[in-house]
Amino acid sequence: MRNKRIVIIGTRTWELTSIHMEYFVKNNANIVGILESPTEGITTTTSGGSSSKPINEVAEELNIPIICGKPKGEGVMDQVRAWKPDIVVVIGYQFFLPDEFLNIAPMGVVNFHTSLLPRHCGRHPGFWTIWYGDEQSGMCVHFMDSGLDTGEIAYKSYVPVENGDTVDTLYDRIWKNDEPIIKQLLDDIESDSVPRTPQDKSEYTYNYVPHESDFEFDFRQRAQLLVNRHLVKPNKSYIVLNGTQYPVAACTAIDEPTTSRNFKLNTPYNHKGNLVYMTPNQWLQVDELIVNDQPSAAFAIAQKELGEIATI
């Protein structure tokens, strides 16, 4: 067991918490207490299903004291102080930590954020990484300050973002690569030498909770990006035909069907009996739409809504 005293903050229903908690235990972290998030109102873009144990079960097995609450909840900060942590580690917690909380441990508070800060600060970073077509992602361990994911960076890991990724597959690739970071963090905690590099605030981008309107296909984006957006939340993306919103069940990026680009944006065309739209790179073929909760041929639906569709 290592010497430095660590308090872990996390959420029992989040894989981010359970997977990384397993790494901390495996690498002999001296965990003296756990603050667990209340689960009411917690949102996620992952599907769950981790084989790692939730933090409440780990706490019970290892006889680690655990409390559940928000940072300003009655007695929460007093209990964290009573554990006398050298450092606090956050691995999945949606509640803002006030300055009084950040100052409890002499070495401060570090947070595990699943994006390459300062890009994609805030919520659901994996979702937005895929949404914006980033080619690379990873884990960032940073010190927490009064801003939102704006504190000094300690470590980063890097993985590629692949076509066809979902939030689950991207996070799985990142998190499987995180044990070396945790071992390095624990080693540096022991020697009081956790590195601190200021973020470039000019590169800061903030995420928000996805809105229904975000899922309408924007044909100003390249076709493969639209396919990836569809895959990140299947059956949520949609097109509008004659004022009616149709969820997309299947779509494909296809090579240019013609040498001409004399076509209108946001306009459906008929290509060999398929419904297609021009994008800045390739064309998007919409194969199936959802009607009455069932996938149906997109071109037939478009014909019914629009009548004759121009052929390319």
Where are the language model's segments positioned?
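A short, sequence-level motif marking secondary-structure junctions
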Residues: 249-256, 288-294
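One-carbon transfer enzymes
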Residues: 1-235, 271-273, 281-285, 290-312
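Short, isolated positions in well-ordered beta-strands
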Residues: 244-248, 284
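Short conserved beta-strand and strand-loop elements enriched in small hydrophobics
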Residues: 237-243
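Low-complexity, glycine/alanine/valine/leucine- and proline-rich hydrophobic stretches
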Residues: 254-287
